[in-house]
Amino acid sequence: MVARRTVELIAACAVVTHGVALSSAPVSMGNSLRSDFPILQQRIWEDKPLVYLDSAATSQKPSAVLEAMQRHQERDNANVHRGAHLLSVRSTEAYEGARDKLARFVNARSRSEIVFTRGATEAINLVAQSWGRSNLQEGDEVVLTVMEHHSNIVPWQLLQEERGIVLKFAQLDEHECLDVAHLRSLISPRTKLIAVAHVSNTLGCVNPVSEVVTAARAAGAAVLLDACQSVPHMPVDVQALDCDFLVASGHKMGGPSGVGFLYGKMELLEKMPPWQGGGEMIRDVFLEKSTFAPPPSRFEAGTPAITQAIGLGAAVDYLSAIGMDAVEKYEHQLGTYLYSRHAPRLCACVRACASPLGSASSRRPALRPRLSEIPGLRLYGPDPRQGIPRAALCAFNHETVHAADLATFLDQVES
């Protein structure tokens, strides 16, 4: 996969871009929000300010999120749904309040369409093991794309081994965006699901969900969206998208790790069997058999990640207060800025890595090329200057410099 050897520069998300110390940045949202993030206040590498550009992997957390989690641990820590005492009631209210916030954030029709999971990976596995086992037979088809994260490939490969389903992969077009015509050509009467990234974590392209959904509906297929790179960066409306399933991870939304969510249309969730067994997902338990709770409880077996869910709710509050339209606009400016401005330090790092001596003097080239003009640099995904929708992230390789070497140089370069 391309992502294994790429260096990623992410000028992405209001919860991260405030770490970008660019003296002529397009607007000041980043600088105004930087103080909200305790981790960005530290000094590193000879007393230089921390500049964090790895949000596509995990985002940093604002004080509001950290404080909400600490407050719960210090004041309200108790199990949810299982006690009548004050702490349990308060903990349950906060936990379910986070579900309400997520439902509003993605415009779900009902709070019951939001299932808490450990993250997007678990959410996709839940769909594969519950919906997939109930609806996919030998010879049925799942259409994916070659740009998918491993989390949206491996669960379907496991089901392929178990059930004999067929996996098909849509290719990219000349701009390294989804080739919708090729995707359509893969769809047949046996196609039951199309599972695609809303935004590619490596290519940055924003996939045309409406075209994918239209093609799926014509074949009677369901649609799953991996929205890890879209939910924190742009307005996402599941009703407008008309997807059947959508997954995202809290740690990419300014929230904690260990929590995420699955959105599913209620008419599908109601028909899906439990994936895991345990407390809370049952209605009645007898020695001979058990009956199961309705969604979302049916899919939340055992004690959930309560504090993490509350932290995710606080992250949603934080993003909502900024406004997702404002976040999207700012990130578009940052992405264009990243591609169009001169990149002398990156060029210097490339030259230093490529030089047998790696001398310090090689870090200050006379030329000031733009990112796309650095010799030997291979950029992935569409160029935002071409007017093609894409996220504010950049992945690249160099033809002679190993990604690990270049990443090490970039990690220590002056901000």
Regions found by a protein language model. Give the residues of each.
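Intrinsic-disorder-associated interaction segments
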Residues: V2-A3, P26
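Pyridoxal 5′-phosphate
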Residues: C13-V16, L22-C347, R351-S415
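Sec-dependent signal peptide recognition
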Residues: A3-A12
